[in-house]
């Protein structure tokens, strides 16, 4: 998934260069390039409909690895999202953001595995960030930093007390 998303980022830049002569990814103006870049960032962040890989990967990894995937591995795509926010397709980004916020919250309610709950929480939070970036890119960065801090605290606490399921948390 990540390799395909990286390929889409490069493809969007190449298509933009063919049509406009501009290779700078922060200066995309060709509509197809903007659409591809928006989809690629959605894939990298795990936004709906490109979210299917994220809960399964988090569930299959240790809490420490899941922490890194939920926070540190989101820094590069969030940076690209911030730098290219003016070039992204607003309709596609808004659609993915609203769907991520709704589906992340809804699917998280149906889980008993802690890592899957946190994965769907991450999808929902990233949906909120994708909505915010349209109006205030700097506020999105602040939101992401706070999300990373809170998520790190939760993952490290769960790792310390060795919780894997909600049922073991109550005992």
Language-model features and meaning:
Residues 1-171:
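Core, highly hydrophobic multi-pass alpha-helical transmembrane subunits of bioenergetic inner membranes
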């Amino acid at each position: 998934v990540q390799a395909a998303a990286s390929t889409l980022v490069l493809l969007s830049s190449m298509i933009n260069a063919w049509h406009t002569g501009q290779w700078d990814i922060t200066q995309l103006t060709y509509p197809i390039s903007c659409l591809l870049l928006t989809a690629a960032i959605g894939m990298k962040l795990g936004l709906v409909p490109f979210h299917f890989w994220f809960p399964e990967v988090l569930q299959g990894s240790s809490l420490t690895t899941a922490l890194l995937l939920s926070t540190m591995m989101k820094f590069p795509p969030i940076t690209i999202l911030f730098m290219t926010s003016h070039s992204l397709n607003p309709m596609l980004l808004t659609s993915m953001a609203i769907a991520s916020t709704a589906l992340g919250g809804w699917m998280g309610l149906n889980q008993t595995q802690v890592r899957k709950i946190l994965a769907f929480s991450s999808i929902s939070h990233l949906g909120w960030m994708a909505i915010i970036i349209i109006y205030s890119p700097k506020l999105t960065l602040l939101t992401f930093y706070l999300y990373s801090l809170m998520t790190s605290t939760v993952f490290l606490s769960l790792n310390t007390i060795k919780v894997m399921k909600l049922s073991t948390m109550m005992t």
